[in-house]
Amino acid sequence: TVAGIVRLRVPIGYSQPKRGWVNPLREAWGLKAYQQVSPELQARVCQTATLVPSYEGVAELARLWDCEVSDDLVHRHVQEMGAKASRLGPLPAAPWGSSTEFSLVIMMDGWMARERGPDWGVSWRRKTTERIAWHEVKSAVIYRLEQAVRTGKGRGLILEKYIVATAPDTAPVDFGQAVRAEAMRRGLGRAKRVYVVMDGAVWLWHLARDRFAEAVLILDFHHAREHLQAVGQALYGEDDQRVRQWVGPLITQLQRGKEKRVVKTLEELLSKGRRLSSAQRKVLQREVGYFQEHQDHLHYQRWKRSGTPCGSGAVESLGLQLQRRLRTCGQFWKRPGLTHLLRLTVLFKNHDQNVLWN
């Protein structure tokens, strides 16, 4: 237990209906047969395992509770409870809380997890081996707009947010279903407005239009800026000063509600640019198409005035947090181990651990 080893003498009896010996107290406490770790200790080591870089680190921290556990014990219980969490059906609806009107913000993105490839264990001297495999973990952050505040020093802060993170290679359709289910738990059906913020990945936009048809879709401002930067670099190469001089005014126009002028500038540059090289023209055609497709998702001045986020920093921050645990030096995961720990991480971050430890 969290208080060390506790030995109890308890009565047991023979059950005629069960035709075996039973331990009523063990059953009343919810302990399985031969279980030697209390539910509270199990919950603590599992939660700690989602925060520190290794199972060995969990064992070291447990000693601060005067509790001697091994990293093998931690690993075993993380995998046991993570597997149980992965088998859970739809979670119960969250309490509604305040009845005042609110807006809901949904941000989606992905990051790459490092797993053991099909040739894991084969000598690195063989050049054709696939020892390491990279697969995308799709993630989302959901929060009420009114929960976004600023500190005294002006730093942005979200008071209460919820996350979705699915196993590597989860299909976009299944990820979209998971995001919508979590959004419904957090008030999607009651929200006055819904904003979906994301980068330009095609699968994200298909998902958003399919699952959140009535939402306001917003292209992450920093990704829009990166695409303008790509045009500037195609035109002026390594001349950073000329690139900044060309890109700067267009970024300012985006910020000041002149997004149509930005799109028109790019279109004119493509149509009148007779001296463009084939490589420059290829980049321009790609970026003009990009901004034409997203010209209804660029109203940054309007959204900023209403307090609506124009960037997907919250979900990118989530990706970095997960990578600090799941992609540190020397970590090469098997799929079950990664999936189980990821599932526990989501439960703890969403304060849903009571479905496993009540």
Q: What residue ranges belong to the model's regions?
A:
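Catalytic center-proximal scaffold of phosphoryl-transfer enzymes
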Residues: 12-358
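N-terminal juxtadomain amphipathic helix
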Residues: 1-10
